[in-house]
């Protein structure tokens, strides 16, 4: 599980579609699809229900959305703390 996969997953969840997330992140549709599929394979469960042009989160996807947001927020805080210590 990589931070970039989590970032893409969150974008798809927030945008409600792979296409919209890809546009927002300036990546290809296949990049977003592969990232979410890799997470699903690693976790052994579906994270999103894919409809014609939209997606909805499964219960597992809702858990991942909540926890991934925490992880990425903490990673950003860590980065800022380290950068601040170097500037001193």
Model-derived features: where do they sit?
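The N-cap/first-turn positions of alpha helices
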Residues: 2-8, 61, 68
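Short helix-boundary/capping micro-motifs
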Residues: 11-28
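Helix-turn-helix DNA-binding elements, focusing on the entry/boundary residues of the two helices
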Residues: 17-18, 36, 50
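Alpha-helical residues within the helix-turn-helix
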Residues: 23-24, 41, 62
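Residues within the DNA-recognition helix of helix-turn-helix
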Residues: 28-31, 35-38
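A short LG(V/I)-centered, amphipathic sequence patch enriched
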Residues: 40-57
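Short helix-loop hinge/linker segments at domain boundaries
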Residues: 52-55, 62, 73-88
């Amino acid at each position: 599980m990589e931070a970039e996969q989590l970032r893409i997953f969150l974008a798809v969840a927030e945008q409600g579609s792979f296409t919209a997330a890809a546009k927002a992140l300036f990546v290809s549709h296949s990049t977003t699809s592969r990232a979410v599929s890799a997470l699903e394979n690693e976790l052994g469960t579906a994270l999103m229900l894919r409809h014609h042009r939209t997606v909805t989160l499964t219960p597992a996807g809702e858990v991942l959305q909540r926890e991934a947001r925490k992880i990425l927020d903490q990673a950003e805080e860590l980065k800022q703390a380290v950068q601040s210590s170097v500037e001193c």
